[in-house]
A protein has these predicted regions:
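Catalytic PLP-binding core of fold-type I/II PLP enzymes
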Residues: 157-189
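Conserved N-terminal alpha-helix of the aminotransferase class I/II PLP-enzyme fold
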Residues: 19-67, 89-90, 94, 100
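PLP-dependent aminotransferase-class I/II
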Residues: 105-143, 147-152, 157-164
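Active-site C-terminal subdomain of aminotransferase-like
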Residues: 115, 141-142, 146-148, 156, ...
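Conserved C-terminal alpha-helix-loop-beta "cap" of PLP-dependent enzymes
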Residues: 80-82, 274-348
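Conserved PLP-anchoring active-site segment centered on the Schiff-base-forming lysine
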Residues: 77-95, 124
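General beta-strand structural signal in soluble alpha/beta enzymes
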Residues: 9-12, 61-65, 87-88, 147, ...
Length: 349
């Protein structure tokens, strides 16, 4: 790789700091004296703004410090010791969270995903298998379904798919949890037909990602039915997810939800990724799936990897069975136009 200059970096979507409006809000409130642990007026106003955006006036809203803590806290708060969580085998909790769910004493009931997604039939199959097993008293019972929007591959659940998952969860008395670490990029995609209000209507809990979507750090957990998860703040504390200076989270989400910034902040990334994806196809590269958000996955042989990595940076997601690399190319709300142009030029041989 060429090290003589800084290469355009598409390795991930959380390399930059925060949106200017978020930073301005933090600076403007820096010397305020506020109560701690999310009880301040900024957190309360941010909660109200989120409730309005989700059309969920009675929702509980909590601010946590990061995605792993959020997933661990929510899953542990919902599940009893003999219960497990159904998840895609490619899901974040199953692949890249260092066994935090298992460390909390809960089994992940993973099932093969297609382009990062599972469906209602998968959930029904797992529930039916457990229910029909004569040894089920010796087995973990499915009680929660975990998905993400977008998925780890940048693909999207359609409204119809989410409605079907929600229906089977209600029929089977399961909870439905949507990881929204990159939710801003889903909301900004022209291919998306799932709104915040839909998430509030169809899920038992979801979270609105900040760390990857314009804040310095932080995620906002939305529980549409008030009081349905008891002692959640206590459980946040137990998982190291409760910030003493909680107003730092409230101020950031206040800025993100004023004037609908969160709903549009992902648009530049989605447009940039669409350009990169089309440029890759024109250059003859194999784009493995048409993910309509801010992530692109492309299969590279050794020569292609060496040629491209000399001009731009990206991450290697995995090695494919045929020996090629699956590269992940990510954009963010802050990706410079000149970096996108540089990527397009890097593909011209």
């Amino acid at each position: 790789m060429n090290s003589s200059h800084v290469l355009p970096n598409f390795s991930s979507d959380y390399q930059e700091g925060a949106h200017a409006r978020v930073l301005d809000a933090l600076v403007a409130t820096n010397m305020e004296q506020s109560s701690g642990y999310g009880t301040d007026e900024h957190c309360e106003r941010a909660r109200d703004l989120i409730r309005q955006a989700c059309q969920a006036p009675d929702a509980d809203v909590y601010f946590l410090v990061g995605g792993t803590q959020t997933n661990a806290t929510v899953i542990d708060a919902i599940l009893l010791p003999w219960q497990g969580v159904i998840a895609p085998n490619t899901g974040h909790i199953n692949m890249h969270e260092a066994g935090i769910v298992e460390r909390g004493g809960h089994k992940i009931l993973d099932t093969p995903a297609v382009e990062g997604k599972i469906n209602a039939a998968d959930v029904e199959r797992i529930c039916s298998a457990w229910e029909g097993d004569g040894a089920r008293d010796h087995m973990i019972a499915p009680a929660l379904v975990y998905i993400s929007q977008p998925t780890e591959y940048g693909t999207l659940y359609s409204l119809e798919e989410l409605e079907e998952l929600s229906a089977v969860c209600r029929e089977r008395d399961l909870k439905l949890f949507v990881d929204g670490a990159r939710l801003a990029y889903a909301l900004a995609s022209p291919a998306n037909d799932v709104t915040l209000a839909d998430l509030a209507r169809l899920t038992d809990v979801f979270y609105i990602g900040g760390t990857k979507c314009g804040s310095l750090f932080g995620e906002a957990v939305v529980i549409p039915e008030r009081g349905s998860i008891r002692q959640f703040v206590t459980q946040m504390k137990q998982h190291g997810a409760l910030l003493a200076k909680g107003r730092l989270l409230g101020v950031q989400f206040e800025a993100l939800f004023e004037d609908g910034l969160y709903l549009t902040i992902g648009e530049p990334a989605v447009k940039a990724t669409a350009r990169i994806r089309e440029a890759l196809k024109r250059a003859g590269y194999v784009v493995t799936m048409d993910s309509p958000t801010n992530l692109t996955f492309v299969a590279l042989d050794q020569a292609g990897h060496e040629r491209l990595s000399d001009k731009v940076r990206y991450s290697i997601w995995e090695t494919l069975p045929d020996g090629r690399y699956l590269a992940r190319i990510g954009t963010s709300w802050a990706t410079p136009e000149e970096d996108v142009v540089a990527f397009e030029r890097a593909l011209v041989r």
